[in-house]
C-alpha cells in the first residue's frame, strides 16, 4: 500500500470534503465570483480555479478576486496547473495533472505550506505517487463527464475502491458526481468530492452545495 505523503498532515481532510472546481462555461452567464460566493454559502470547503482558456493576466486577476472572496471564510484557494499564478496570488494549494509540471519540480518552487494535489488516471499513477510529495490524489474521472473529455475511461466505483486499497493518501473523487451518486462515491473510499457542473451549472449554487454538504456530512 502506498503511504501518505510526509506533507499530508498540512491538508486537513475537512478542507477537501466539498471541493468546487470552477468552469466559466457552465456558469450560465454568471460571474465566477457570483457562483463561488453562493456555493460557499452552501458549504463548499475548497475552491480550485481551473480556467485554461484565460490568459495569464486574466487568470491572475480572477485568482486574486477569488482569494479575497474566500479568505474571510478560511476556505483554501487551489490553482490548477499554474505555479506562477499560485505564487503570485498566495494560493493555499496547487493541483497538477499528468501533463502539467512534474510534482517534484513544483514542490521545489512552492512554499512548504502550499499543498499539492495530483490527478491519477491509472493504478500505475497511484503507485508512482508513493515517491512524490503529494498531499492528496484527484481520482479522475469517476464517471463520464462532459466537462473534461481528455481522460482515460472512467474509474467507476470499483476502480475507486481499488485506489483506496492501494494508498492511504487522501482521495478526492471527481467526474460526473452529483447528489444522486455522492453517497456511494464516499462509501467507495473518497475522502472528498470535487464537483464542477453540479455547482457551476446549478440554478442556485447555494442550494446545490447545501444538498451535497448534507449528504457528505451524513456519511
UniProtKB/Swiss-Prot annotation:
- A GO term for molecular function: thiamine-phosphate diphosphorylase activity
Q: Which residues bind 4-amino-2-methyl-5-(diphosphooxymethyl)pyrimidine?
A: 48-52, 80, 119, 148
Supply the PANTHER family for this chain.
THIAMINE-PHOSPHATE PYROPHOSPHORYLASE, THIAMINE-PHOSPHATE SYNTHASE
Enumerate the UniProt keywords alphabetically: Magnesium, Metal-binding, Thiamine biosynthesis, Transferase
NCBIfam families for this protein: thiE
Give the enzyme class: transferase
Question: Which Pfam families does this one have?
Answer: TMP-TENI
Q: Which residues bind Mg(2+)?
A: 81, 100
Q: Please state what the protein is called.
A: Thiamine-phosphate synthase
Which family does the UniProt entry place this protein in? Belongs to the thiamine-phosphate synthase family.
Q: Which domain of life is it from?
A: Bacteria
**Catalysed conversion reaction:** 2-[(2R,5Z)-2-carboxy-4-methylthiazol-5(2H)-ylidene]ethyl phosphate + 4-amino-2-methyl-5-(diphosphooxymethyl)pyrimidine + 2 H(+) = thiamine phosphate + CO2 + diphosphate; 2-(2-carboxy-4-methylthiazol-5-yl)ethyl phosphate + 4-amino-2-methyl-5-(diphosphooxymethyl)pyrimidine + 2 H(+) = thiamine phosphate + CO2 + diphosphate; 4-methyl-5-(2-phosphooxyethyl)-thiazole + 4-amino-2-methyl-5-(diphosphooxymethyl)pyrimidine + H(+) = thiamine phosphate + diphosphate
The encoding gene is thiE
Protein role = Condenses 4-methyl-5-(beta-hydroxyethyl)thiazole monophosphate (THZ-P) and 2-methyl-4-amino-5-hydroxymethyl pyrimidine pyrophosphate (HMP-PP) to form thiamine monophosphate (TMP).
Q: Does the keyword Disulfide bond apply?
A: no
The record's Gene Ontology cellular component field reads: cytoplasm
Residues bound to 2-[(2R,5Z)-2-carboxy-4-methylthiazol-5(2H)-ylidene]ethyl phosphate: 145-147, 176, 196-197
- What EC number(s) are associated with this protein in UniProt? 2.5.1.3
Q: What pathway is this protein said to act in by its record? A: Cofactor biosynthesis; thiamine diphosphate biosynthesis; thiamine phosphate from 4-amino-2-methyl-5-diphosphomethylpyrimidine and 4-methyl-5-(2-phosphoethyl)-thiazole: step 1/1
What the record notes about the co-factor is: Binds 1 Mg(2+) ion per subunit.
Does the record's keyword annotation contain Magnesium? Answer: yes
- UniProt organism field: Albidiferax ferrireducens (strain ATCC BAA-621 / DSM 15236 / T118) (Rhodoferax ferrireducens)
- Tell me the InterPro entries matching this sequence: Aldolase_TIM, ThiamineP_synth_sf, ThiamineP_synth_TenI, TMP_synthase
- What biological process terms from GO does the record include? thiamine biosynthetic process; thiamine diphosphate biosynthetic process
Amino acid at each position: 500500500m502506498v503511504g501518505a505523503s510526509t506533507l499530508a498532515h498540512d491538508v486537513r481532510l475537512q478542507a477537501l470534503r466539498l471541493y468546487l472546481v470552477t468552469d466559466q462555461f457552465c456558469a450560465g452567464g454568471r460571474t465566477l465570483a457570483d457562483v463561488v460566493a453562493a456555493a460557499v454559502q452552501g458549504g463548499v470547503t475548497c475552491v480550485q480555479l481551473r480556467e485554461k482558456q484565460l490568459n495569464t493576466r486574466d487568470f491572475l486577476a480572477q485568482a486574486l478576486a477569488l482569494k479575497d472572496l474566500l479568505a474571510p471564510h478560511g476556505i483554501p484557494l487551489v490553482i490548477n496547473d499554474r505555479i506562477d499564478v499560485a505564487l503570485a496570488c498566495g494560493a493555499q494549494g496547487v493541483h497538477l495533472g499528468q501533463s502539467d509540471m512534474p510534482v517534484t519540480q513544483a514542490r521545489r518552487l512552492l512554499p512548504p505550506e502550499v499543498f499539492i494535489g495530483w490527478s491519477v488516471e491509472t493504478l500505475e499513477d497511484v503507485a508512482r505517487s508513493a515517491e512524490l510529495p503529494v498531499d492528496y490524489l484527484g481520482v479522475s474521472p469517476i464517471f463520464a463527464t462532459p466537462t473534461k473529455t481528455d481522460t482515460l475511461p472512467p474509474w467507476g466505483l470499483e476502480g475507486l475502491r481499488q485506489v483506496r486499497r492501494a494508498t492511504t493518501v487522501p482521495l478526492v473523487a471527481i467526474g460526473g458526481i452529483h447528489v444522486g451518486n455522492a453517497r456511494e462515491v464516499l462509501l467507495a473510499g473518497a475522502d472528498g468530492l470535487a464537483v464542477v457542473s453540479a455547482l457551476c451549472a446549478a440554478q442556485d449554487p447555494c442550494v446545490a452545495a447545501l444538498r451535497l454538504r448534507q449528504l457528505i456530512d451524513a456519511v
